[in-house]
Amino acid sequence: MICNARQKEKGGKPTGLEYLEVGSRVRDDESKRNKVKVDEDHGLYEFFRHKDKALSTPAEEGNHGRPWSAEELRGKSWEDLHSLWWICCKERNRIATESYERDRLEAGYGEEDSEKRDMTVRRTQRAIKQVLTERYYSWQEAQVVAKDDPEIDLSGQGPIYTPRDFEEDIEEEVLAESEGEVEQKPAQITA
């Protein structure tokens, strides 16, 4: 038998987990454990789909939608895409946690459904990356076009966008000037 060294030094009798037989499994006496109060909204609970059970049933695991397509995501704002990305990350963590628990408990079910669900989430993340890449390339192209546009000033001095008159407006101004009538131009747009 093995006895905890601290208990021997104190001269006390070992209790609970301190006294074990060699080669035996640890037997936990729940009455001797301290009850730890845990916050109901603890962040680690987000690694599990349910607070009261470690694994989802096959029906729960197979009950999921389709991945978001890039076409659907193109209309979303940056904040929406950012939120959806982190929701996907949390979902992949839940899937990985349940997969680990399933292997640990040798449950023997749910692996195929779990892989399908993970593939769905990964496809959504791939679509988010595609949309953000498209936006980045569009932004780069817009910068190149803006450098050659006389209405746009990227120097940081003064207004960014100064609209020019349309050709029709210029022709009307020339006619008005020749007749002596000049209209006031609208104020410039600043950003």
From Swiss-Prot:
Entries under Gene3D superfamilies matching the protein: 6.10.330.20
Subcellular localization(s) per the UniProt record: Mitochondrion
GO cellular component terms attached to this protein's record: mitochondrial large ribosomal subunit
UniProtKB keywords: Mitochondrion, Ribonucleoprotein, Ribosomal protein, Transit peptide
Protein family membership: Belongs to the universal ribosomal protein uL29 family.
Organism field: Sclerotinia sclerotiorum (strain ATCC 18683 / 1980 / Ss-1)
InterPro entries noted in UniProt: MRP-L47_sf (IPR038340), Ribosomal_uL29_mit (IPR010729)
Subunit annotation: Component of the mitochondrial large ribosomal subunit. Mature mitochondrial ribosomes consist of a small (37S) and a large (54S) subunit. The 37S subunit contains at least 33 different proteins and 1 molecule of RNA (15S). The 54S subunit contains at least 45 different proteins and 1 molecule of RNA (21S).
GO molecular-function term, one example from the UniProt record: structural constituent of ribosome
Protein's recorded name: Large ribosomal subunit protein uL29m
